[in-house]
């Protein structure tokens, strides 16, 4: 079925988002549909199957849906509107089954998310919704919602009722001055949070972070532990010092998935006027963050504000993202400077820049669509990227064993208000995805690999022994001289070949030597970092033991104080409050006492691993890399001896 018919049937309020790398989900006219199996048949886009999702809870016709948020695996879908939030659970048969085996209709569970909060407060609205990529546990799948009351609320999507886990209130932190004696006049304008995003938890950790931004471009961070959801206490909020050089009209803040998130995190700040600011966030030893503005880009001027496009294709969302304006769809690649930033190689440089490629231009030539111009509305293009079916690739693309055909589809409007579409197909192979040597484009072609000289061992094995030059008495003098000259020519050719191979061996040895030197420098830097970390752990352990002693003394004093107080003696409110505070401190001291042995075990484990690494490096034996060169030198000497012997025989024969 042609995708043109699908585009023509969409209304101006249709919302389209990728569900999986090979399928999209569309909400339009109070219906939720999934389209799978996209192919390119002679420059005409087609889809294989249309699946209508029958929801258990019908979405009201008056509900306005402006965005669809999809989980990492596509099993949860959130329909977001200014005054509504609906959660849809997608069945596994839609995500796994082949397109031709899917039914035309499929039942899905649907339920509203905290609708009572929106019904009780008429002025409350939804600002942003974010999903935590990883589950906290088997029964908790977390989503965060920013409401207009400057509160971020966390919900468990696996619960229909009582799904609220935690609420983080930023209202008391939006204003730096809290002096009641000073009257603050904001002239009717008040600060409010405009966007936020989550830093996913690292492997084998049980915490994540929140980075939020308000209308004055001030940042706020919070460190959330999974235990906060169970115990119900809000985390501490840190206000970040103002970052210089950022625009004062922020629109959206997004976390960018990178190849090495352990060292730092990268965010993109979308501001008015099409300005993109890439922020590198470094955590410090106190659990806070330090912001660094890496670079800033300005997209071509267009009507409306740019919008980041969701993507489910891994090769297009790691160290890169897509952003749509009212006239074009762009791909932004931060891999060059991020790889240089996180690399410890001495040859790396930090002068590399962000790469921006235009995927689709919404200006259609007049000879193709005479009634179509670029979209002139106040919002960004509706864009989506989907992986095409691999089996229908062209003959040239089949030569690449691990190639992917990605369709970038853009939906716009013509003069008559009817929907139109443009698309671009890019081919990404294994070379592009690993080395990032090609760029986005309609005619994207991978660069050929460098010409290899082959294995030196194979070249040596291919050399056959020279035929013996036998001169008997029955052979005439001229024939003997001719045979000897041919043998000398063969010897010269063999000598030249051995010289070339020797040069290649020398070049390889130099390359190995330089690599070994670079590896040695890396090992020294790692050793230095291990020593620094070990010293830090030792200092921390000493401080922890000192703290433990102080805690023991404080605990004894608290216990003595508790025993001195008679239970029948009435206490004042201040005394009761003091004793409650003392109990809290006693609990905190007990928790800190439990942490000291754990820190000791961790430090001992680091010592043990460092000793193992040093022992392995000390017992390593260097292989003899010049054995083949010595063997070739011996063969060359034998050939020279045979040549001298033949010269002597020829001189005696001529005499």
From Swiss-Prot:
Q: Which UniProt keywords apply?
A: Membrane, Transmembrane, Transmembrane helix
Q: Which domain of life is it from?
A: Eukaryota
Designated gene of the protein: npp-24
Where it mainly occurs, coarsely classed, is membrane
InterPro entries, per the entry: Nucleoporin_Nup88
Q: What is this protein called?
A: Protein npp-24
**Topology versus the membrane, per the UniProt entry?**
Single-pass membrane protein
User: Carries keyword Heme?
Assistant: no
What are the transmembrane regions?
263-283
Question: Which Pfam families does the UniProt entry name for this protein?
Answer: Nup88 (PF10168)
Tagged with keyword Amino-acid biosynthesis: no
- Subcellular location, in the record's words? Membrane
Q: Which GO terms describe its cellular component?
A: membrane
């Amino acid at each position: 079925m042609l995708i043109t018919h699908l585009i023509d049937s969409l209304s101006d309020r249709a919302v389209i988002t990728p569900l999986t790398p090979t399928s999209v989900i569309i909400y339009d006219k109070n219906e939720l549909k999934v389209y799978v199996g996209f192919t390119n048949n002679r420059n005409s886009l087609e889809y294989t199957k249309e699946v209508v999702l029958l929801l258990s809870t019908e979405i009201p016709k008056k509900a306005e849906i402006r965005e669809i948020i999809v989980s990492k695996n596509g099993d949860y879908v959130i329909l977001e509107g200014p005054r509504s939030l609906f959660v849809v659970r997608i069945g596994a048969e839609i995500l796994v089954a082949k397109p031709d085996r899917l039914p035309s209709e499929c039942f899905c569970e649907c339920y509203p998310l905290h609708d009572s909060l929106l019904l009780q407060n008429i002025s409350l609205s939804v600002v942003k919704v974010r999903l935590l990529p990883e589950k906290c546990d088997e029964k908790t799948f977390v989503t965060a919602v920013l409401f207009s009351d400057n509160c971020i609320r966390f919900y468990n999507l696996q619960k229909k009722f009582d799904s609220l886990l935690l609420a983080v209130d930023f209202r008391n932190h939006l204003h730096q001055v809290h002096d009641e004696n000073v009257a603050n006049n904001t002239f009717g304008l008040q600060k409010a949070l405009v966007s936020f995003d989550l830093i996913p938890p690292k492997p084998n950790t049980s915490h994540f972070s929140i980075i939020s931004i308000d209308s004055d471009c001030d940042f706020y961070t919070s460190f959330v532990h999974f235990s906060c959801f169970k115990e119900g206490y809000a985390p501490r909020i840190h206000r970040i010092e103002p970052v210089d050089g950022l625009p004062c009209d922020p629109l959206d803040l997004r976390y960018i998935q990178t190849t090495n998130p352990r060292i730092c995190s990268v965010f993109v700040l979308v501001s008015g006027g099409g300005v993109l600011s890439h922020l590198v966030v470094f955590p410090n030893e106190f659990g806070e963050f330090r912001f660094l503005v890496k670079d800033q880009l300005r997209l071509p001027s267009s009507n409306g504000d740019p919008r980041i496009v969701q993507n489910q294709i891994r090769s297009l969302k790691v160290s890169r993202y897509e952003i749509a304006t009212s006239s074009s769809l762009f791909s932004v690649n931060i891999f060059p400077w991020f790889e240089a930033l996180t690399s410890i190689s001495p040859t790396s440089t930090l002068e590399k820049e962000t790469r921006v490629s235009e995927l689709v231009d919404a200006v259609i030539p007049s000879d193709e669509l005479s009634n179509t111009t670029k979209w002139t509305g106040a919002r960004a293009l509706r864009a989506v990227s989907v992986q095409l079916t691999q089996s229908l690739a062209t003959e040239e693309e089949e030569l690449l064993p691990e190639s992917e055909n990605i369709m970038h589809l853009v939906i716009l409007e013509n003069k008559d208000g009817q929907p139109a579409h443009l698309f671009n197909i890019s081919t990404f192979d294994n070379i592009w995805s690993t080395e990032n040597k090609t760029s986005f484009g309609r005619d994207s072609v991978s660069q050929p690999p460098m010409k290899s000289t082959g294995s030196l061992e194979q070249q040596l094995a291919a050399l056959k022994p020279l035929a013996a030059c036998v001169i008997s008495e029955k052979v005439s003098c001229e024939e003997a001289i001719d045979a000897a000259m041919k043998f000398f020519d063969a010897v010269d050719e063999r000598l030249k070949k051995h010289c070339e191979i020797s040069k290649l061996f020398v070049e390889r040895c130099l390359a190995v030597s330089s690599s070994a030197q670079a590896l040695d420098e890396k090992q020294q830097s790692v050793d230095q970092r291990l020593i620094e970390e070990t010293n830090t752990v030792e200092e921390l352990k000493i401080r922890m033991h000192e703290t433990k002693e102080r805690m023991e003394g404080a605990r004894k004093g608290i216990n003595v104080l508790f025993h001195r107080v008679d239970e029948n003696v009435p206490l004042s409110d201040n005394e009761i409050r003091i004793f409650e505070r003392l109990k809290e401190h006693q609990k905190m001291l007990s928790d800190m006492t439990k942490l000291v042995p754990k820190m000791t075990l961790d430090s001992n484990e680091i010592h043990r691993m460092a000793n193992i690494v040093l022992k392995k490096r000390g017992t390593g034996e260097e292989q003899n890399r010049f054995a083949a060169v010595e063997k070739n030198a011996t063969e060359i000497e034998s050939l020279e001896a045979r040549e001298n012997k033949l010269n002597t025989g020829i001189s005696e024969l001529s005499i």
